[in-house]
Amino acid sequence: MAPKAEKKPAAKKPAEEEPAAEKAPAAGKKPKAEKRLPAGKGEKGGAGEGKKAGRKKGKKSVETYKIYIFKVLKQVHPDIGISSKAMSIMNSFINDIFEKLAAEAAKLARYNKKPTITSREIQTSVRLVLPGELAKHAVSEGTKAVTKFTSA
């Protein structure tokens, strides 16, 4: 009950001169956001709010590699599980490697004055970023995956 009483004076405060000067940006932004949805398409504004709730859920579920890490783990060691903390570390590791490879491939494309990153740039960036034997295995697996993809 008390919050409702506080909300009513808050609605009156923008009408007053002094609080309006202090809280005009905050009070101004909230009605604008509320006006944008109903003003856009009347009843569909309510559906727009539902879409926003859907978008919020979409924002919460950030794309991760967790499913794929788990699938690979089960292929290699079917009887072993993984903790959520270890999964988070693995996900961060893959994101880090991905960023390094993407940055290196972008540099290579820029050096060669090419607008497109091709499999050649990716392969070269793998050789530059990953050390020794790991790079060789990654290149062979990548080549195998690309040929499988193109033949399918």
Curated annotation (Swiss-Prot):
Residues 1-16, 34-52 have a biased composition (Basic and acidic residues). Keywords: Acetylation, Chromosome, DNA-binding, Isopeptide bond, Nucleosome core, Nucleus, Ubl conjugation. It is found in: Nucleus; Chromosome. GO terms for cellular component: nucleosome; nucleus. GO terms for molecular function: DNA binding; protein heterodimerization activity; structural constituent of chromatin. CDD domains: HFD_H2B. Residues 1-59 are annotated as: Disordered. There is a cross-link at residue 148 (Glycyl lysine isopeptide (Lys-Gly) (interchain with G-Cter in ubiquitin)). The modification N6-acetyllysine is found at residues 7, 35. SMART domains: H2B. Can be acetylated to form H2BK6ac and H2BK33ac. Monoubiquitinated by BRE1 to form H2BK143ub1 and deubiquitinated by UBP26. Required for heterochromatic histone H3 di- and trimethylation at H3K4me. May give a specific tag for epigenetic transcriptional activation. Belongs to the histone H2B family. The nucleosome is a histone octamer containing two molecules each of H2A, H2B, H3 and H4 assembled in one H3-H4 heterotetramer and two H2A-H2B heterodimers. The octamer wraps approximately 147 bp of DNA. Core component of nucleosome. Nucleosomes wrap and compact DNA into chromatin, limiting DNA accessibility to the cellular machineries which require DNA as a template. Histones thereby play a central role in transcription regulation, DNA repair, DNA replication and chromosomal stability. DNA accessibility is regulated via a complex set of post-translational modifications of histones, also called histone code, and nucleosome remodeling. This is Histone H2B.9. The gene is H2B.9.
